[in-house]
Amino acid sequence: MASTADPAGFIIPAHVPPERVWNHDINAFARELDDPFVATARLHDGPDLIYSPGTARGNPCWIPTRYKLLNDIFMDAKRFSSEQNIGVNLLLGVDWRLNPLEIDPPAHMGYRQVLQPWFQPSAVKELEGMIRRVACELIAAFEEEGGCEYVDAFASLFPSYVFLELLGLPRSMLPQFFEWEHTFIRSPDMGARIAAARGIKDYLETYLEERRDDPRDDLVTGILTAQIKGRPLDHGEIMGMVMVLYFGGLDTVASSIGWYMRHLAKDRALQVRLRENPEEIPGAVDDMLRAYGVVATRRTVTEDLTIDGVEMRKGDFVLMPGYLASRDPRQYDDPHMVDPARKARHVTLATGVHNCLGAHLAKREIAIVLEEFLARFDNIRIPEGEQDEWQTEGVWAVTRLPLVWDR
């Protein structure tokens, strides 16, 4: 059968049933309501699997809308490859990928084993003093002011400073790092994205060469001197590993803690509960992670198959929005509420062979933020007459969050 064009002018492959076609860009769809997570949850009223021919950046893709289907695909690395998850190699014209993120089993395991010692619970525990010091340093700048613009004053800086310390990078470079990272992840201009990716690559290559001559007891030296099955990593393997840390360290946690503080500022009862019962903060962190999945990763179908009664063809892309799994009412009671006692599984940090290596670090960072803010400030809120702002291109993020509080 031949492909057809739908009324919006998009080409629909012949194997896609017309009733599964959804003519929207999911990021624009998310902006139709005051809360993008509630907005995209409207997709739960339709099929469990839809096809979007005109989604972000012109990449037609399947979109699973339910937790179970998303979880099943995450767990099936054989039929759903992660090799073109982000596709930096295509933009740069290089033969290496972000690893282990874009490496399929079994090869990915060697790369995970290089990084795992630096992110396991015992290693994160050793970092706690540094993480809390960074948080307190930033809070001290506005603690007596009665309020702040949370994104610029804290959320963008806190996880970034932690990341810079982990990799031994200078804070003075942070404005440039932000510019490259934001352009690469969020710009609709492909030329600008390519230029940003090249800027990141060139800087990191120079830095890694300098660090070869300056070994330290840290993560970068650990990567530079690592071996897999008795052989050292080559240049591309090292670059792929450091670049995946760059993107994860500068954006994902920073974007996430904006949503968490926004939620807290709108939920006075949750503030009181956590302040009076700080032992519940880890549970709150888990359910905030569940409720606010900010990333939609990508998989590529490796063979013709049928799922949810629909044919998928080898080479089809699948968008994996954590925010659709997060708010699935089939999986969670009252999914839009954050409940520290929920104790429910989620896929915000992915699952299966590509579950997030930095999960323990991210959870500890988030917990420290909640601990330090709740210990200092009462009745954290968005001031009357002010509004928060957010965006849904790339990693979903709060871009402005004015806060005031009582002492």
Describe each PLM feature range.
Residues 1-407:
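Cytochrome P450
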